[in-house]
Amino acid sequence: MGDKNDKEDNLSLPKATVSKLIKEMLPQDVKCSNETRDLILECCVEFIHLISSEANDICGREQKRTIAAEHVIKALTELGFSDYTQKVSDVYDKHKLEVSTKSKSSKKFENLGKPTEQLIREQQLLFAKARSAFQASPEAQQLQQLQQQQQQQQGGLQAPSVQQQTDINTTTTSTIQK
């Protein structure tokens, strides 16, 4: 449907982010017009296209299928932006460190040294205890009484009493513990 130029026209950077960066870089007494902001935005997009195109070429020459950070750093050097390579490398190293730290913390609970079956039994025991505690609460007893009254009014079967339910839960809990 659309050609390559249509896709490129839709590619841009968030204006709010670019505006924020411009504001941070300029002295407080200097303002930036919308036209200037748009021009800077276009320049940034063009710069990204230039770097990514060169990184893609480097990637192709190395017969790789995925553009890596190293390709981007080489592209900066080959295009005459070697002044930026150290900063880019530093930011990339920091990013790798953050990702590895985040990955380690997400796996923190992965292997607690207990088999899955034991963890499931412990979870079921906790559920049974919570259920017993709730059923022993005054709110649960009131709810139970209301349900019994409704069933009696409807002529249905009588629900087990709170004591009967507690006995059932105690039996269930002791069975799970075994």
UniProtKB/Swiss-Prot annotation:
InterPro entries: CBFA_NFYB_domain (IPR003958), Histone-fold (IPR009072), Ncb2 (IPR042225). Residues 139-178 are annotated as: Disordered. GO terms for cellular component: negative cofactor 2 complex. Its main location: nucleus. Keywords: DNA-binding, Nucleus, Repressor, Transcription, Transcription regulation. SUPFAM superfamilies: Histone-fold. One of its GO terms (biological process) is negative regulation of transcription by RNA polymerase II. Involved in transcriptional regulation. Component of the NC2 complex which represses RNA polymerase II transcription through binding to tbp and thereby inhibiting the assembly of the preinitiation complex. Belongs to the NC2 beta/DR1 family. Heterodimer with drap1 to form the negative cofactor 2 (NC2) complex. This is Protein Dr1 homolog.
